[in-house]
Design a protein with these regions (language model features):
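Flexible loop residues that form catalytic
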Residues: 46, 99
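A short helix->loop->beta-strand "cap" motif at the edges of active sites that frequently abuts
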Residues: 12-14, 69-70
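C-terminal alpha-helix
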Residues: 115-119
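Alpha-helical membrane segments in multi-pass integral membrane proteins
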Residues: 38, 43, 56-64, 71-75
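Hydrophobic faces of well-ordered beta-strands that scaffold small-molecule active sites
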Residues: 16-20, 41-43, 72-76, 94-96
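Conserved, mostly hydrophobic/aromatic
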Residues: 41, 86, 97, 113
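Active-site-adjacent beta->alpha loops and helix N-cap segments on the catalytic face
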Residues: 1-13, 24-31, 48-64, 79-84, ...
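Structural motif
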Residues: 12, 36, 88-90
């Protein structure tokens, strides 16, 4: 269970990130995970939802509004041209995958994302 994983991670001085891809009731589940002691709660917009035009912004805002202790990570659909609006919401961790890996110039895409995160 997630609770057992959190306990085991903390017992070994490690942190645990829980990915909430495909979770329907984000606020409810985020509160539960926060109470369980998850170190990071990740909002993650999958490819299918990205294809429908969804971004992780709304999910990020919802989760940040209900948690008290956990940090927030965000993933899914983040690219150099969208990362600034994500960073403006001040997540604790930004995960960029396809936005770099699938870019015409992955090195430049990574640099642009890093610059946005560092406020450059």
């Amino acid at each position: 269970s997630i609770k057992a994983a959190v306990e085991e991670a903390h017992k070994n001085d490690k942190q645990l990130l829980v990915d909430m891809i495909a979770v329907q009731d984000l606020e409810k589940r985020a509160k539960e995970l926060d109470e369980m002691g998850a170190d990071y709660i990740a909002v993650h917009t999958g490819y299918d939802l990205q294809a429908e035009g969804q971004s992780p912004l709304d999910s990020l805002r919802k989760v940040k509004s209900v948690i008290k202790n956990s940090k927030v990570a965000v993933a899914g659909g983040i690219k150099p041209d969208t990362i600034k609006e994500i960073v403006a919401e001040e997540p604790d961790l930004v995960i960029v995958g396809g936005g770099i890996a699938n870019a015409d110039d992955p090195v430049e895409a990574a640099k642009q994302c890093r610059d946005a995160i560092e406020g450059k």
